[in-house]
Amino acid sequence: WASPAKVEGNGQGRGNSGVYLLGKYEVQILDSFDNKTYFDGQAASIYKQYPPLVNACRKPGEWQTYDIIFNAPRIEKDGKLARPGFITVLHNGVLVQNHSELQGGTFYDRPPEYKAHPEKGAIDIQFHGNPVQFKNIWVREFKELLPPEKAKVANKLKELDRKSTRL
């Protein structure tokens, strides 16, 4: 993404946009180069939850990159949270969100909260009234890795299953 080279506006009025995951969890897009704004509204913040670890913004007009790794929350059919969501973000190759635990949806006007939703869904680009360009958007699905203790059990079960099918 890139904000315009000619700087107009300040704070949240400069290159304001966002990447929405499942329509509920926003990674903020903002021209944060020499631009003061609230800490959890900067570029690469998890909006209204976590500021970036560092400001990795390039100058206005230069292309920025985000690598976003999203582990969707798991919400039971009864609406109870089974597992929170997590987001990792690299901004221009710099780690700025390190497996940050989502507190719920990212809202500008109320505290975060989880509400039931599908485990898979849309990735949306927010239009917030400011010009922002986008190119080369890629989406890849990663298989979920099991924690080491669960992986050992899963591997043992596979091994037992293979042995039981041999004649």
Where is each model-derived feature located?
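Carbohydrate-interacting regions of secretory-pathway proteins
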Residues: 1-166
